[in-house]
Amino acid sequence: TIFASDLAWPTAIVCYDGGVFVGATPEILYLKDTDGDRKSDERRVVFTGIGGSLKRLNMQSLMNSFRWGLDNRIHGTASGTPGKVRVVGKPELGTVSFVRSDFSFDPRTLDFRIESGGAQHGMDFNAAGQKFVCSNSHHIQQVMYEQRYAGANPNFMPRSPLVDIPVDGASAPVFRLSP
């Protein structure tokens, strides 16, 4: 059984309220089976604008890694793809613009915000809620703080919130699994 079809580049998925949020650039959709036939009956575009302004997308830079955070928000990374994200059908919530950032959203209120990160290929949390990201050049980094807190002080110029933490150095061999 195919739960959902006609998705453009689905690269992220997370469960919520009997359905799933799916990241399919430039949209985040909500899909749900409402009649028990294991096929999506409800299909709703919730957010749009992630990479939507680009004429050509880089396959290595698509949104990915939907994860639940300890803050009860769904977190993801937009990789290197810029965004001007808005909630479909709710213009009063405005637009959130970003470049090379991660993001999170509250699935109940649809509050969307920028998060520190900018992972290319992955993002996850450990059991203590610490955030880790990776890319080709930096195969494991820890996100030490959220930029929005440091940015509140105009007299403080913080270092990058990303810290390389691999024991084998900043760049290691990358072994592709896909054909």
Label every model-predicted segment.
Residues 1-179:
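Beta-propeller domains with acidic blade repeats across secreted/periplasmic ectodomains
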